[in-house]
């Protein structure tokens, strides 16, 4: 029979005491007072931060937005149907953040960066705060590189630069999203990563954008963040910030990015819903007082970074829908005042068959020719002026019966210039194709053609130059200038093609 040795027992007890570490966890908790309509009011949570994530007993996550004297107003990231009054809530100590990585390219995700395309999880090691401060003045440099959209009307007269914020504004069904998707398609081979954020859109519209991008191989460099019309208001409010965080990840890694918000007015409506339910005082059009800050802190994150930070860029293209052309409503005026210019799409032009329906007269880019290559500046200088004069003359010509020859010629030229700006959807043009198109129009080579023949002639001219004068494209891409040599080549091509075209026409 073994004897029990007291010293061994005491040694074991001493070892166990030494190994014992007592973990004390202090958790900031509260109790649900009221829940409903995507909002919960919590008693307690004394040390919660503004914007901190809180976790409910059944797993729902919320964001603390209203810090009041006797309760905390929390917006829920989900339906919150299982949350009960009296259940406990704990503060997580974290601000909303999302995982980020290269693996997100080609994927469709929601506002919490979770995949919704049914293609499995996305691996990532890094994370970024959904809301992070915009780069300061010293960290930026002025915009000087063009972001080509592939649309002649924009690239020649309302140029967009890398790091700029350009608003696309117009009534519903005027082709706003088409301008944005064409811009994405045109970034193929340009080393630009695109992020498309769909806020409060129909799921069918988002699916259509995804399928267009997939067909053209553009999803390889695109991320789509989608919160459709049936998503909770909180997630619609967060979606643009999620998109911005993903674009920033690439921007700070010395890459060029372009982000499209479609559309911030839906985000403002979601924010208005949340604010009214939180009993914040309503202002103009029932929006809360800080709705300007909602959009300014989002769009200020677009930047062209300085050389010290690697010269990455983030170009923002917000799309805002107007009601029957009223750009003086609250959200449109706010976004116009934040952005560096706007592209107006007109329902009248769209219905008249001018597509893209860009109203060149009232569209503007505040970066201007700094965002154009020299060749485009040389060629497109007088295009906008001629179109503006034509628009004025056209209005006048409706009342005048007998016009002199010079006025008739100017009207004829203007009609042909307007014709050359027309483009099919998903058919962006390269810079050299745009330069030859604009040059042909502004130098009067189209004046002898019927208006109906203009587009056919231009399509054939582009093909002819590509096959018979490849040096033209080489000169433009290597020197970025419209040299005398390039002009001679183009003149030859136009004359040769014009002869062929007129011969075909006679046959």
From Swiss-Prot:
One Pfam family here: ATP-synt_ab_C
Role: Produces ATP from ADP in the presence of a proton gradient across the membrane. The alpha chain is a regulatory subunit.
MF terms in GO: ATP binding; proton-transporting ATP synthase activity, rotational mechanism
SUPFAM superfamilies per record: C-terminal domain of alpha and beta subunits of F1 ATP synthase, N-terminal domain of alpha and beta subunits of F1 ATP synthase, P-loop containing nucleoside triphosphate hydrolases
Binding locations of ATP: 170-177
EC numbers, comma separated: 7.1.2.2
Recorded superkingdom: Eukaryota
Protein name in UniProt: ATP synthase subunit alpha, chloroplastic
Species lineage: Eukaryota, Viridiplantae, Streptophyta, Embryophyta, Tracheophyta
Subcellular localization(s) per the UniProt record: Plastid, Chloroplast thylakoid membrane
Organism: Cucumis sativus (Cucumber)
PANTHER family linked: ATP SYNTHASE SUBUNIT ALPHA, MITOCHONDRIAL
HAMAP family cross-referenced by the UniProt entry: ATP_synth_alpha_bact
Reactions accelerated catalytically: ATP + H2O + 4 H(+)(in) = ADP + phosphate + 5 H(+)(out)
Membrane topology of the entry: Peripheral membrane protein
Site (Required for activity): 363
